[in-house]
Swiss-Prot record:
Functional note: Copper amine oxidase that can use putrescine and spermidine as substrates. Required for abscisic acid- (ABA) and polyamine- (PA) and H(2)O(2)-dependent induced nitric oxide (NO) biosynthesis. Involved in ABA signal transduction and in responses to osmotic stress.
EC number(s) on file: 1.4.3.21
Cofactor note: Binds 1 copper ion per subunit. Can also use zinc ion as cofactor.
InterPro entries noted in UniProt: Cu_Am_Ox_Cu-bd, Cu_amine_oxidase, Cu_amine_oxidase_C, Cu_amine_oxidase_C_sf, Cu_amine_oxidase_N-reg, Cu_amine_oxidase_N2, Cu_amine_oxidase_N3
Species of the source: Arabidopsis thaliana
Protein name per Swiss-Prot or TrEMBL: Amine oxidase [copper-containing] gamma 1
Length: 712
């Protein structure tokens, strides 16, 4: 057999293409870039200025590392260990080592900036190093080997290098030829390894699955089913190849998703472009790149390699006094768990931990103005470190915009009194902070939405394409009693594999301060009415219980045993004596149905409950643990919570998992409609009355003149 050199060149090109699509690599001043960073072009906003990241300085204790700081960390690390200079040491993450929470809370604008440190996770010599770099002194203050199970977050270099390894194997190349696939059409991706026992312990491994690009960009719909490769990530060599023989490759026809190459007739009337106009400009402002001020809200927002986007120090102005009052110190998606429901070879290991295994930041593509974000949006870049420690930029990774969709925040008309003509209504205008990440076939859109009544709504929307399985069958009638357990047939030779999505959020609630918060479980209990006392037979009574320890706060939601869950500050009372609080309001949700001793569920044990409360611990940030790749579940939220520490009247963290089961159908093929799930953080006796009374209605005179009618 001839050496498939063209295929290797193609995969190399394909890998670099993905790198350039993901990262904003830059090479010189002529391109408008400097020091490996990008000068952002203004998109979607007339008031947004260009940002030269090479000149940025931190202004707030929680501001992310700047380009200058990342370059300085790289220099310090090179002096600390020759591995960083030679390239044998790989940086898997570099982020701000946030100052102690108490110091951040006390800091005020105008004060001297707190000490800046960088937290680095690096890998070399088969060991994971957690390194702290003091930027003020220019030295490494700690270098500790993490000996827990698991490995650090993958780099895209890991992923792209592993995808090329199978081409070194003669057996693999023969399998590709046997399937009639040209090497020039080959596209290989790297589903993560999971953890399934001793065979894979002691070395970093990854799976490789291949598809064909022939006839479509949507290669996810054309899997080379039955061919599975396991690769040693450190040695970059094939460990195992499983070839079950050729299975029919699904057709390319009808799978292309790019708008410019669609050739099918569209049987719907065209929708005219829609835009929300703001003649006076947006109502929010962004100070120093990260501090957002809008209506009665102030919060800090930044991009993060692992979490994607972090909201910090969210405060809302009191509607009676104007006092800024703290609501949440820090909120972010801590982990995404996506287990697939196919126990067969080639699929059983697919139980992704997207945040901890690959990161939501590096996979966040630039948001598309007018389609991802509306007019008058403000864009924020992400600044991260590459595996060799050089700064890189994810342009337009986060957008901020005001949303008005014709919704009503409050209304009332009075009709009971003669001569009364009372019609009061307030439009619902909200502020949204958004980011989107493309993790393989799935895209996730994260929205943090702030309302003037003090409510925060968090929404996660899933989009993109399914991960499908090839099958010999092209009609359900051919299956007979052999219906595939993995999922339904959604197109010829295509099984939509059943799977779950679980997103666990870290919500460090600070209701009127970081200390003295408690969880109150508000139980709705059915009461029987004594015979003869009333025509009614039953009613609901509210009973409140304060959670004393962590196990009191391990909560499974139930429609038939309803609770509300309030985080309160018992030391801050309203004028009628109620403790100030916020409650978490779950939306539609789903629970994991996997056995607790199933390896994916051991690692994803943070989904065993929908709500948890733990005492604040700055080392407990990630629900699946710091090192989650091939981890064994020994450092999860479940493990921490089982210590059963006290949580009453303390600085506490609320954890909430939203989820949904996904049984695919034909409408999910070849691309999926966006599906969203959400929850709310809602004031509960926090204000003396509804702040919405202070919002103003819209008037025609304040708006631009537009054509107000549609054709009849």
């Amino acid at each position: 057999m001839a050496e498939p050199s063209f295929a290797r060149l193609f995969l190399l090109f394909f890998s670099f293409l993905l790198i350039f699509a993901t990262y904003s690599w830059v090479f010189g001043p002529d391109s408008g870039f400097l020091f490996g960073t990008r000068v952002r072009k203004t998109l979607g906003s007339n008031r947004q200025v260009h940002v030269d990241h090479s000149l940025e300085k931190p202004h707030h204790p929680l501001d992310p590392l700047t380009v200058r700081e990342i370059n300085r960390v790289r220099t310090i690390l090179s002096n600390h260990d020759p591995g960083f200079g030679s390239g044998s040491a790989t940086i898997h993450s570099m982020a701000l080592d946030e100052p102690e929470k108490s110091r951040v809370v006390q800091w005020k604008k105008g004060n001297k900036l707190l000490s800046r440190r960088a937290a680095v996770v690096a890998y070399w010599g088969g060991q994971t190093h957690e390194i702290t770099v003091d930027l003020d002194s220019g030295r490494v203050v700690s270098d500790v080997i993490n000996r827990t199970s698991g490995y650090p977050i993958l780099t895209l270099n890991d992923v792209f290098a592993a995808s090329q390894v199978p081409l070194k194997s003669l057996e693999f190349n023969r399998s590709i030829e046997a399937r009639g696939v040209k090497f020039s059409d080959l596209a290989c991706i790297t589903p993560f390894a999971g953890w399934f026992g001793s065979e894979e312990e002691g070395r970093r491994v990854i799976r490789v699955q291949c598809f064909t690009l022939q006839g479509t960009t949507n290669y996810f719909m054309r899997p080379l089913e039955g061919l599975y490769v396991t690769v040693d990530l450190d040695k970059l060599e094939v460990i195992k190849i499983i070839d079950k023989g050729p299975i029919p490759i699904p057709k390319a026809s009808g799978t292309e998703y790019r708008f410019g190459v669609q050739n099918k007739p569209v049987h719907m009337d065209r929708i005219n472009p829609i835009s929300m106009e703001q003649p006076d400009g947006p109502s929010f402002r962004v100070e120093d790149g990260h501090l957002v001020k809008w209506a009665n809200w102030v919060f800090h927002v930044k991009a993060d390699q692992r979490a994607g986007m972090i909201i910090s120090q969210a405060t809302v102005r009191d509607s009676e006094t104007g006092e800024p009052r703290s609501v949440m110190y820090k909120g972010f998606p801590s982990e995404l768990f996506v287990p697939y429901m196919d126990p067969e070879e080639g699929w059983y290991y697919k139980g992704y931990m997207d945040a901890g295994e690959l990161g939501l930041g590096p996979t966040a593509m630039p948001l598309v103005p007018l389609n991802d974000c509306p007019r008058n949006s403000y864009y924020i870049d992400g600044v991260f470190a590459s595996p060799d420690g050089k700064p890189i930029v994810q342009p337009n990774m986060i957008c901020l915009f005001e949303r008005y969709a014709g919704d009503i925040s409050w209304r009332h008309s009075e009709i009971l009194f003669a001569n009364a003509d009372i019609r009061e209504s307030r439009p619902k205008v909200t502020l949204v902070a958004r980011m989107a990440t493309s993790v393989g076939n799935y895209d996730y859109i994260f929205d943090w939405e702030f309302q003037t009544d003090g409510l925060i709504r968090v929404t996660v929307a899933a989009s993109g394409m399914l991960m499908v399985k090839g099958t010999p069958y092209d009609n359900v009638d051919d299956l007979g009693d052999r219906e595939d357990d993995a999922g339904p047939l959604i197109s010829e030779n295509v099984i939509g594999v059943v799977h779950d999505h679980f997103i666990t959020f870290h919500l460090d609630m600070d209701i009127d301060g970081p200390m003295n918060n408690s969880l109150v479980k508000v139980h709705l209990e059915k009461q029987r009415v004594p015979t003869g006392k009333s025509p009614r037979k039953s009613y609901l009574k509210v009973k409140k219980y304060i959670a004393k320890t962590e196990k009191d706060a391990q909560i499974k939601l139930s429609l038939y045993d309803p609770y509300e869950f309030h985080i309160v500050n018992p030391n801050r009372k309203s004028r009628v004596g109620n403790p100030a609080g916020y409650r978490i309001v779950p939306g539609g949700n789903a629970a994991s149905l996997l056995d607790h001793d199933d390896p994916p569920q051991i690692r994803g044990a943070f989904t065993n409950n929908q709500i948890w409360v733990t005492p604040y611990n700055r080392s407990e940030q990630y629900a699946g643990g710091v090192l989650i790749y091939q981890s064994q579940g020994d450092d999860t939220l479940q493990v921490w919570s089982d210590r059963d520490r006290s949580i009453e009247n303390k600085d506490i963290v609320l954890w909430y998992t939203l989820g949904f089961h996904h049984v695919p159908c034909q409408e999910d093929y070849p691309v999926m409609p966006t599906v969203a799930a959400s929850f709310e953080l809602k004031p509960a006796n926090f204000f003396e009355s509804n702040p919405i009374l202070g919002s103003a209605p819209f008037f025609e005179k304040d708006l631009p003149v537009c054509r107000p009618f549609a054709s009849s």
